[in-house]
Swiss-Prot record:
Lineage, broadest ranks: Bacteria, Bacillati, Chloroflexota, Chloroflexia, Chloroflexales
UniProt cofactor(s): Mg(2+); Mn(2+); thiamine diphosphate
Stored InterPro entries: DHS-like_NAD/FAD-binding_dom, MenaQ_synth_MenD, MenD_middle, THDP-binding, Thiamin_PyroP_enz_TPP-bd_dom, TPP_enzyme_TPP-bd
Subunit relationships: Homodimer.
CDD domains: TPP_PYR_MenD, TPP_SHCHC_synthase
Pathway(s) where this gene product acts: Quinol/quinone metabolism; 1,4-dihydroxy-2-naphthoate biosynthesis; 1,4-dihydroxy-2-naphthoate from chorismate: step 2/7; Quinol/quinone metabolism; menaquinone biosynthesis
Protein name per UniProt: 2-succinyl-5-enolpyruvyl-6-hydroxy-3-cyclohexene-1-carboxylate synthase
Gene that produces this protein: menD
UniProt entry keywords in alphabetical sequence: Magnesium, Manganese, Menaquinone biosynthesis, Metal-binding, Thiamine pyrophosphate, Transferase
Amino acid sequence: MTNRNIFYATTLVDELARAGLRFVCLAPGSRNTPLVLACARHPAIKVFSHLDERSAAFFALGLALATDTPAAVVCTSGSAAANFFPAIVEAHQAGVPLLALTADRPHELRDSGANQTIDQVKMFGGFVRWSVDLALPEATPPPVVVRSLRTLAARAMAIAGGEPPGVVHLNLPFRPPLEPTPVAGDITAPPDAAQPRQAGAPYTYCLTATRSGVPEAVIEQIASLLQQHERGLIVCGPRCPSGEFGALVSELADRTGYPALVDGVSGIRFGYPGVIGGYETFLFGEHSFPPPDVVVRFGAVPTSKWLNQYLDTAAPSAVIHVRAGGVWADDSHRVSHFIAADESAFIRALLPHLKERRGAWIQMFEEAEAQVWSAVEAALNDEPYFDGAAVYDAVSLLPEGAALFVGNSLPVRHLDQFGKPGARRIHAFANRGASGIDGNISTALGVGAGRPDTPMAAIVGDITFYHDMNGLLAVRRCGVPITIVLLNNDGGGIFHRLPINRFEPEFTDYFVTPHGLHFAHAAKMYGLDYVQVRDREAFRRAFRESIEARAATIIELRTDARADLARRPALMRSAKASDVRGL
């Protein structure tokens, strides 16, 4: 591999082959040279050369029809790609698995009048199941970029051949040189991240469960993998299933001896025995926790920065992600097995194959968990009262079955760090799809309207509150008795965690954007009760009274963002399990 283009194309095509691609139809051109060479030189791929792109695409369609597996067609940039369209329409309508790989000009030539350059991004519209416009190859790509090429290829094959089968379009821009000419400074040998996990095997296995569930052979393979490794983790991110899932995760943790690290808005942080919630603190900064060998994931990408960093640095040999609907959530591109299946059904099928195991590994996490909450509780009465303590107290005061919505930015992170797991079942919600601060109050009120028989609370920051203040009109119009905890640190407090905080005056003027607002008048305008608090005793009293009375109340806690910022890492350092044993 002599330059970045050859490296990218070779890595992508190699993973397509590992995922099952056997037939590729090639049409001549210049811009697709790296792809042509990668396909022609791969020993597992049979290539068919065609003079015309339209014929090549239909020939690939025939291959896919005959084999019932995805076939690929490759072309250069410009109108060559448009000639794929008739075959793509047919493949879409007939449900035939097909990969369209179109080479493209670099981004700076798009919309510039450059020769043989058209808009190829999503050019096949709704006739494809998935369309990706790849980034330009880099001279020395970081490992995550190389891993992303392999997971992209695995996903492309899985989606094209999934249920229903159809077309996947990958658009690949290249700058010259397109031929295998050596370029000084370009990557010449694959880094470790580019290597497959074992000879001939895919980097990521993608499996979609059938109506009868996950095949027994796959369940047995996963069970065998878990039994081989004592050091494992169960990680539950946001938006895990409801129903029996939480109890099944607890049972899976007991059976495997793996700690279950559950996100504050996973749906199972509160009310399920044995789950771990203090990881944002005990994994903070430098720590002595050994890396896990295997990770079983459910839900979306975790909220916790330090948990994500720990998992990425650990580079487990196996990361098994189970998620109904097949929605991908792996921004570090570490997943080795992606199983699109009902999570509860998967665990139920897996449990009979596992022998109960409990060792020093899980005890280490349980000891760290106990130490974290002991340190947090010891610091709660320290002055001044801070936002994380208010979140801890709100969770501790909510009754069984209550609903809690947390706003984005800091509150959702505070819940993840300071929401102590407990016996009471609390239903926690957040807008973690795009993680915006817009519409959070309205979403919280919608949650309350959907659960009219249980107490409802929301915790939001001041900028989030300001963004959706008009949503408060629904409190009276729709009859939603909600307790809103307003954490007012006079601006975008989360920006204090970013390196830009060292650069004044721009940091204060354009990132924090202090507003100097108090929100008593907003409460009065929309007909809500209002309480401003400054200490722990006042907050706990106001929150308890509002929840018990099912009153529509705004409880405003004014804090200092810089003081809160200093308080959190100091608490984390004091709570860290510094004496964790090496295993």
